[in-house]
Amino acid sequence: MKPSSASRFSLTFSHFLTLYCLLTQTHVAQGSHQWQSPIKTVVVLVLENRSFDHLLGWMKNSVNPTINGVTGQECNPVPNSTQTICFTSDAEFVDPDPGHSFEAVEQQVFGSGPGQIPSMMGFVEQALSMPGNLSETVMKGFRPEAVPVYAELVKEFAVFDRWFSSIPGPTQPNRLFVYSATSHGSTSHVKKQLAQGYPQKTIFDSLHSNDIDFGIYFQNIPTTLFYRNLRQLKYIFNLHQYDLKFKKDAAKGKLPSLTVIEPRYFDLKGLPANDDHPSHDVANGQKLVKEVYEALRSSPQWNETLLVITYDEHGGFYDHVKTPYVGIPNPDGNTGPAPGFFKFDRLGVRVPTIMVSPWIQKGTVVSEAKGPTESSEYEHSSIPATIKKLFNLSSNFLTHRDAWAATFEDVVSHLTTPRTDCPMTLPEVAPMRATEPKEDAALSEFQGEVVQLAAVLNGDHFLSSFPEEIGKKMTVKQAHEYVKGATSRFIRASKEAMKLGADKSAIVDMRSSLTTRPHN
């Protein structure tokens, strides 16, 4: 007998109701999963110019054998010779700085080959093309006991052994990717763009539009001010002096949802650089990481915190893992300058990346990415991509790159309760450098860029070639004083403008007053 129309309606409605309930439960479960993420505070520390193999490669031998590290069989040929130079474990204090420009990295990655498939066979060749003969230096890594803070963190928490810099190039483009998933077409330092400020949207803008707080704790200068938007008045109270505020905020449980820590970039007696940029002592970078960890470990926020430690780029040091070159999306349609017109379709060299949280299992090694596409990789754009997920931001992705990048929220998803056995303190660190900082040394390229940023904040960029020339003439000590003064002046003027009721989207336009302000 055929069912009546009423019974058919009842059956259909019943199926509809069941399906609706299932979909609703699934939706609620997914939403509640996002809402219940244990991480409420993400702390990011980006250090300078070290490759994975150089800093962490030897931990495969004595800390965790599952790490994709080195064995000592990794070698590079010496050009015009039958000799090779193989990777060793006797890295020490490095001076001068190995090559890491866009052109230098091309040579390191491709060697003398046709330039299509990375061989990682050109590090020695490139080092020999520069003054100082660093051909053996770039083929050396640190023993775990030489970087004891990292050895302990790798043992206790998570290391990512397939995390790459965002482009095969120097500091600034890669640092720009960390919080904006693009360098806006830059493959090197662009003076005009620096003066204007890079225009792209950042993860800070996304957080702000979603009413989620962030803070930048700086030691010399907040280099996040390379982004033009970050110079707006509305963000001026997000800038904090690290030495005055970080430990206090951590102790009070008042660290912002996204906490960015910037290291010291200038090497002074009694106040050494701790950014790990050669020729700075890596021991001081270890001390900074130890200080940050211990402040977080004793904070009321510890059980909801994820600390991300990474490096902007490899600094010219050898790494054996071939750089990805398939399926890498251009972030925003921009290309690099002539003559190469780089399409931003390749990643840079692998860099050390460590993550710390009581929600991470001991001895975790994260290697292959798990989407969102088959070609996705961990790279600096993974940071804004993951922040978007963790904080359930309604904003769009910043670029095609962070939409593609692998995210790392899974690293804190395997425990049902936070660990209680995480160490309260990390090992003490012995200095590697036997001498004092060279305060009268000339500036590195990166330090010169920081001085030019300070010149913009100071209003001195209106004086034609002044920023470029002053950087060439300054010593490290003079640059530190200039940068410190410029930063303080800009922040003070911006806060005054806010008190006077200026438009929050405005940027204080400083004017130089060289007659009243000394420039050594």
Swiss-Prot record:
Induction: Not induced by inorganic phosphate deprivation. Belongs to the bacterial phospholipase C family. It is an enzyme of class 3 (hydrolase). The keyword Secreted applies. InterPro entries: Alkaline_phosphatase_core_sf, Phosphoesterase. One of its GO terms (biological process) is phospholipid catabolic process. Residues 1-31 form the signal peptide. GO terms for molecular function: phospholipase C activity. It comes from Arabidopsis thaliana. This is Non-specific phospholipase C6. GO terms for cellular component: chloroplast; extracellular region. The gene is NPC6. Its main location: secreted. It is found in: Secreted. It comes from the Eukaryota. Pfam families: Phosphoesterase. Its EC number is 3.1.-.-. Keywords: Hydrolase, Secreted, Signal.
